Amino acid sequence: AAFACIDHHRGLRCGFPEVIFGAGKSIEELVRIVRLLIDKGNDIMITRTTKEVYETLLEIDSCMVYYEQARIIALKHTQIIEELPKIPCLKAKVLVVSGGTTDIPVAEEAAVTTEMFGIGVERLYDVGVAGIHRLLDRSDKLRAASVIIVVAGMEGALASVVSGLVDVPVIAVPTSSGYGLGEKGV
């Protein structure tokens, strides 16, 4: 496709295929990109997309899956991840934490993306610092994680609180939900 330069070998180089950012692309462009990827035997993952795009892509491959809350379309038919057991992160357990329920779509995007790459995920949602007991009551989940992704918009303090409770990497993802100083977030 003249409008897109597809990286068909990313899976071989990196252990996971190229991800398509769906926002701003027309359905026709996404159809052309998906056809090119399928023709080369690649897995498909489209982020920030819609059910309308999914319904169109089902005509190309009925095995497509739509994760509505995460806004992701996926098709996994290769075993690239399983063929690369030497990648240490595959044994990790990622915990995705959300501050509030309005942060869940971004948290689900992180969770589904991580799962697509063959990494185990647990979810811990609606545990923002306004009700800190909800987080502290689940400290066993925090301690069991190898990596924690914290998605929060309203207060922006959750990632700092979590990082003070654990000795593993904490990835902070700000969202545009709620009010306060998080600004526009993801």
Segments (PLM) and residue ranges:
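Glycine-rich phosphate/nucleotide-binding loop
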Residues: 157-186
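N-terminal loops that bind phosphate or other acidic moieties
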Residues: 33-39, 51-53, 63, 73-74, ...
